[in-house]
Structure formats: C-alpha cells, structure tokens
Curated annotation (Swiss-Prot):
Phylogenetic classification of the source organism: Bacteria, Pseudomonadati, Pseudomonadota, Gammaproteobacteria, Alteromonadales
Protein name per its UniProtKB record: Putative membrane protein insertion efficiency factor
Annotated source species: Shewanella frigidimarina (strain NCIMB 400)
This protein's record includes keyword Iron: no
Superkingdom to which the source organism belongs: Bacteria
Function comment: Could be involved in insertion of integral membrane proteins into the membrane.
PANTHER family named among the record's database cross-references: MEMBRANE PROTEIN INSERTION EFFICIENCY FACTOR-RELATED (PTHR33383:SF1)
InterPro entries reported in the protein's UniProt record: Membr_insert_effic_factor_YidD
Length: 84
C-alpha cells in the first residue's frame, strides 16, 4: 500500500528530484556516501516527515566533505514510541 505524502513532503521530494535530474548530472558523482545524499534526503523525508527528515538530510549533507570517510549510512528507522 502506497503511503500518501503531505503537500510539503511532495514539494520537498520534487525539489530534490529536480536537483537529481537537472543539476547532479552536470556536477558528476561527488557524494562519498551510500545511498547518495539526495536519495538519503528523499528517504528520510518519506520515513520521518518533512521537518525531521530535512533535519537528517541537512546533518548528512554537512558530513559530506573530503575529511569524512563516507561509506554506508542508511536512514535511521522511525522510532514509533506507541508500539514499544
């Protein structure tokens, strides 16, 4: 079953997809993480919502620099406190 997105989630993921399609090919592969920062941002927004997902994405982008080793860095799972 597909999860419906809020209008803000749709807008954020559309902007990121626009970056992936229009800008990223011109820059070439630069991300040192797997998945790339843009895919991470989309997944974080879909998993955690726009505000928290954007926070995770911003922290990830700030780590994406030559002094960080990079590697595998998946989106953390959603902490659902009601089901504990």
């Amino acid at each position: 079953m597909a999860q419906t997105q809020s209008p803000l989630q749709w807008l954020a993921t559309t902007v990121i997809r626009g970056y992936q399609i229009l800008i990223s090919p011109l820059l070439g592969p630069r991300c040192r993480f797997n998945p790339t920062c843009s895919y991470y941002a989309i997944e974080a927004i879909k998993t955690h919502g726009t505000v928290k997902g954007s926070w995770f994405a911003m922290k990830r982008i700030l780590k994406c620099h030559p002094l960080h080793p990079g590697g595998s860095d998946p989106v953390p799972p959603k902490n659902d406190r009601c089901n504990k």
